[in-house]
Amino acid sequence: KKKKNEAESPRLDPLMRALKALHSAGAPETMTEEELEHLFRDAIREMTPMLDRLAALSTQADNNEADRETAFYIGLLARMLLSAVIEGDRADTAAFMDGVEPPVFPEDMRPIWAERLAFMEKKLAAFPRKTPIDLARQTISDTCAAGAAGSGGVYRLNVPTGGGKTLASLRFALTHAAKRNCSRIIFTAPLLSILDQNAHVIRDYMGDDTLILEHHSNLAETKEAPERLQELELLTASWSAPIIITTLVQLLNTCFSGRTSAIRRFHALCGSVIVIDEVQTVPGKMLTLFNLTVNFLSEICGVTIVLCSATQPCLEVVDHPLRRQPVDLVPQQKALWDIFKRTDIQNAGCARLEELPQIVMGALSSCDSLLVVCNTKKEAAFLFELLQAANCRCFHLSAAMCVQHRRETLQALQSALDKPSADRQRVVCVSTQVIEAGVDISFQRVIRFS
């Protein structure tokens, strides 16, 4: 089934049907040789201006490099067409063989986006606005909502840690999608710990789980009914849900992997809003591919891309830069960043691992919550064992723990920290670097191994 934005002219409709027939069972019997020849002549006439548009995307002065970029864009266009053909073939086959079809969402998604945006705005209105940080987060969120009135393209959300990027980007995406009738909103994050946290926030502020699909390795939908499992499998294969929450790896696979399952999802990016959290984690060796694909998606496929990070990479000054300078959703203001400076960093010097329990207990004498971040799992396990006898409640976090164990430990840790100071024991968390991956939790003091 062809979805909107997969073709820019109705003349491609019969061509897509012909391609689908050729892909699955040879030339259609109802099409004469003259009709097929006519379709291909029309396709050639339509491709000429498209090739001119692709050539115009190049940012290279050198003709050879410009030709290489254009060839890459043509490859992405071919991938998009193949994705649409595969999706139609697989979806129809699943419907015929199993009698299961994914939910059908309307072409005009604006009422759905507007309804979810109203739900979110109501929840945001209940937020406290007492402290300078509360007011700064509100300013960031309001600025993002105002910026959503702009056209599509590439946007940059560069705000300090703790500035409320998840909610601000969600508010931007819903507002923008409601104005431009975007097909779907795709949220990505580089690490599963960040993704789990963001998914919880997004579900809470959307208020309708039927619109949301999570696609990552932490999921095991074993408690669902068999019919729902088949439905989820189809949604995952095609990314046809209105809101997709996935990893950066899955997004990059969708753009570059040669696997048929990845190619099938590529067409779902058309006309969407893609929010890429912690964009600085894109590997340096992939920046050329990443930038060129962002150019293609934003300029040819009508995709709006939001690059989120507190430490933005300079994607416009590499060998193959972004074609357009990203639009900053929040202007850089030193006063705004100063509000979020809540730490005082001190160099504690050198110490042996065996001496650290004494240092930790000394730090606890002036606070009642402490985080110790170790470089290795072995260091964290060793220190945790030594602190078991201390008069405090001690927690251990490590990437070696299974996801459910780590999630339960984080919940217990958060519950301990939420208790009033007068009613709780002193709390110590000994962790590997896993806790630095965007985990939303606060301590009075932190000891970080160098």
Question: Which role fits each region the language model picked out?
Answer:
Residues 1-119:
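Accessory nucleic-acid engagement/destabilization modules that flank
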Residues 124-158:
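Conserved pre-motif I regulatory segment
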Residues 151-173:
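Walker A/P-loop
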Residues 184-195, 363-388, 395-396:
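Conserved strand-helix element at the start of the C-terminal RecA-like helicase core
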Residues 208-256:
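Inter-Walker segment of RecA-like/P-loop motor cores
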Residues 249, 262-300:
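SF2 helicase catalytic motif II
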Residues 304, 310-363:
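Interdomain hinge/linker at the junction between the two RecA-like core domains of SF2 helicases
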Residues 399-403, 424-450:
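Conserved RecA-like helicase motor core of SF1/SF2 enzymes
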